[in-house]
Amino acid sequence: MVEYASKEPSAFAEMLGGLIGANVTSRPEKKQDFDTLVARVGIWVTDIDEGVTLAFDAGKLTVHNGLEPNRTLTIRAEAETVMSLSNLRIGLFGMPVYYDEVGRGVAAKLLQGRLKIDGMLSNIATLNRVTRIFSVQ
């Protein structure tokens, strides 16, 4: 289900791969999203100058060290902000909740430019699906 492109994945790559693997294994609704998602999602953590590319391929995830080309979405933020994305609650119709404390914090960082998501507007459905898979809530 989750594999690593490098024989020596970074700690960040292992952490994200492990988080997603655990979420998908323990929650049927996340598995359904995972099994249908085909996208390449880059995550660049600005304060540690490190990133990964999550290559989702309909039930399989390959985690790459660094940003690989041809990404559908690229998320750029500090480590704390990236981790807060995993705490977003998922509400009605599978949409992320932005009206609680965590959601307001994420929305504020997006508006302030402290969270940047390249490709967001043209791939909002993909972003929502990735958020559902990534969220531990």
Feature annotation, model-predicted:
Residues M1-Q137:
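Feature captures hydrophobic
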